[in-house]
């Protein structure tokens, strides 16, 4: 949960800061823009959380022979419910995240997910939801996607290291 929030927020705010330059601080006084950032933040985070949940369960299933893939539902919905109740995740985003999670869950290949661009969906979500003009975003697509993927690579390394040091 914390890693998903960290990756999504660091990449979103980093992208905004890079794109806006000196105006970055001033934009936080604009209520409309703040609303856009909040909407983007929650949408990106909900997908990042899906990616990390699916990655962890797929990895454990294949590397540790743990076959309880239903745990993905329990983990994701427990965290999402907590975000709704304690952190004021917007209800519309909450409902949409649940729906998208279930769609992805039904179609996931647990044997391959952890090895087949497991964080691509959240990187695309960062690109889609960032409140940046489309003509500028199109110039940044590769950089934006790579920035998130590189952060996820660090999370994957930490996860694997934790698993093997706990043996």
List PLM regions with ranges.
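Amphipathic alpha-helical scaffolding segments
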Residues: 67-81, 149-153
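Alpha-solenoid helical-repeat scaffolds
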Residues: 2, 6, 39-46, 70, ...
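N-terminal interaction modules that seed assembly of large macromolecular complexes
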Residues: 19-68
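Preference for long, well-ordered alpha-helical segments
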Residues: 141-162
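Short, solvent-exposed secondary-structure capping/transition elements
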Residues: 57-72, 85-93
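Polybasic, proline/glycine-rich intrinsically disordered low-complexity segments
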Residues: 77-148
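Leu/Val/Ala/Ile-rich N-terminal alpha-helices, chiefly Sec-type signal peptides and the beginnings
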Residues: 1-24
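Conserved small/polar residues in nucleotide/adenosyl-binding loops
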Residues: 164-167
């Amino acid at each position: 949960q914390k890693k998903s929030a960290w990756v999504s927020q660091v990449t979103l705010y980093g992208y905004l800061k890079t794109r806006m330059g000196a105006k970055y601080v001033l934009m936080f006084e604009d209520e409309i823009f703040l609303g856009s950032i909040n909407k983007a933040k929650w949408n990106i985070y909900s997908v990042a959380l899906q990616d990390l949940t699916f990655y962890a369960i797929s990895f454990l299933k294949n590397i540790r022979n743990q076959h309880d893939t239903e745990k993905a539902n329990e983990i994701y919905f427990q965290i999402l419910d907590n975000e709704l109740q304690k952190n004021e995740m917007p209800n519309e985003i909450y409902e949409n995240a649940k729906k998208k999670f279930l769609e992805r869950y039904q179609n996931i290949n647990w044997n391959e997910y952890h090895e087949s661009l497991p964080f691509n969906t959240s990187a695309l979500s960062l690109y889609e939801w960032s409140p940046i003009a489309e003509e500028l975003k199109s110039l940044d697509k590769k950089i934006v996607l790579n920035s998130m993927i590189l952060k996820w690579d660090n999370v994957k390394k930490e996860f694997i290291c934790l698993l093997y040091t706990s043996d």
